[in-house]
C-alpha cells in the first residue's frame, strides 16, 4: 500500500467503477442531511460490484447483504460530497483527465481503448467520468480533514528508525485484507455481544473455508469492504500499531484476530509477503553558475552573447569564473560566493539546468543554457557518492508513521461523520436513523 506516494494520500479505482443503466422509475433509498441516495444509485453500484467481482474471480454474498453494504458506502460518500460542496472543493477537468489517463496506463491501455471497453460493458463514459470526479472529491475531503489530526513527533521518528535497524525488516511488505466489525465509542453490553456474535460467525466461516473477500464484502465496515477488504501492500511499520504487533510473526495465508480497537473488532488475512533492496546512496554534484536574467534592456540574444564572451574570457585566462560571477551574475544567493552552489543532488535544479550540468565533465564549462530562471553559464566542479542511509531511514520512518496514523484516524473520522449526520433509511415499512 503506497498511500504516502500516491495519495497518503492514495485513490483505488478500477476501470469499471460506474454503471449507467436506464431506470424506468426511481425512488429515494435514504435521506442524508439535505441530500438523498436513490435506488438507481444502489442498483448502479450493485451491478458494478458484481461485474468487478466476476472479473476478479471474487465471491460475493447474497444480494440483500451486498445491497446493505453498498447503501452504507453511498451514505458515507454522500456525506463527504456534501462536505466538499460546503468547503468549495472542486476537481478541475485537467486533473480529472490526468487521473483517468493514469487509470488507463495502470491497466496497460490507452484512454480510447478504455472508452471502448466501458462502452462494451454497457457503461456511459460521461457517467464514468462523473463517478471518478466524485471519488477524487471524497479523497480530497478525507485527506484534508484527516491530515490535520495526524501529529508525528521527532522522537517517534527516531524510535522507529532504531526499531527498523534492529529488526532489519524495513523492506518486508505484506499484502493484507481486512474486516472491520464496528462499535460505537462507548458500546453497551448488548452492542458488544452483537458485534462478538458477528465476529464469531466470521471466524467460524473462515475455518470452514469460506472466502475472506466474500466475508469482507458481506460484513466489513472498512472503506475497502466492497473490494474484498484488500488493503494492498504495506510495510509492517506502516500498519496501525495493533495490527503490526499481531502480524510480526504471521506467515502467508495466516488469519489474525479478532483484534479489539477503539473503532471495533478487526480480522486480518496475510495474502502475501515480499521483500526488496532499495538503494540509498545518491550522487551529489558541486557546481557553480553565472545567471543572466532577461529584461526590457537584456534580450535572450544579448544574454546568450554576453555569456559566450564571459566563457571565452575565462578560458583565455583574462578572468576566472568566481570573479565573473561576482561581477555579472543576477543570482544574489550565489554571486557573492563566486557562483558556488555547493554540494547537492542534481534533481533539485531546473530540468534544463540539470540536464546540461549532468552532461559536463569535471571542470568543464557549459555553453549558455536557458532555463525558467534565465540564461546560465555552468561549471561542474566535482561529483561524489553520498551515503544517505540516515536521511532515507528517517524519511521512510516518517512516511510509515504518517500512513499508520492516517489509516487509524481516517476510520475514526469517517465513523464520526456518519454518527453526526442525519440519516434516514427508507426500506418499505422499515426506517432507520
UniProtKB/Swiss-Prot annotation:
Class of enzymatic activity (EC top level): isomerase
Matches recorded under SUPFAM superfamilies: FKBP-like, Triger factor/SurA peptide-binding domain-like
Cellular localization per UniProt: Periplasm
Keywords, in A-Z order: Chaperone, Isomerase, Periplasm, Repeat, Rotamase, Signal
GO cellular component labels: outer membrane-bounded periplasmic space
Annotated GO MF terms: peptide binding; peptidyl-prolyl cis-trans isomerase activity; unfolded protein binding
EC number, UniProt record: 5.2.1.8
GO biological process: one example: Gram-negative-bacterium-type cell outer membrane assembly
Gene3D superfamilies associated with the record: 3.10.50.40, Porin chaperone SurA, peptide-binding domain
Principal location: periplasm
InterPro entries in the cross-refs: OMP_Chaperone_SurA (IPR050280), PPIase_dom_sf (IPR046357), PPIase_PpiC (IPR000297), PPIase_PpiC_CS (IPR023058), PPIase_SurA (IPR023034), SurA_N (IPR015391), Trigger_fact/SurA_dom_sf (IPR027304)
Signal peptide: 1-20
Catalysed transformations (reactions): [protein]-peptidylproline (omega=180) = [protein]-peptidylproline (omega=0)
Domain (PpiC) ranges: 171-272, 282-382
Parts forming coiled coils: none
UniProt note: domains: The PPIase activity resides only in the second parvulin domain. The N-terminal region and the C-terminal tail are necessary and sufficient for the chaperone activity of SurA. The PPIase activity is dispensable for SurA to function as a chaperone. The N-terminal region and the C-terminal tail are also required for porin recognition.
Purpose: Chaperone involved in the correct folding and assembly of outer membrane proteins. Recognizes specific patterns of aromatic residues and the orientation of their side chains, which are found more frequently in integral outer membrane proteins. May act in both early periplasmic and late outer membrane-associated steps of protein maturation.
Protein name per Swiss-Prot or TrEMBL: Chaperone SurA
Organism: Photorhabdus laumondii subsp. laumondii (strain DSM 15139 / CIP 105565 / TT01) (Photorhabdus luminescens subsp. laumondii)
High-level lineage: Bacteria, Pseudomonadati, Pseudomonadota, Gammaproteobacteria, Enterobacterales
Originating gene: surA
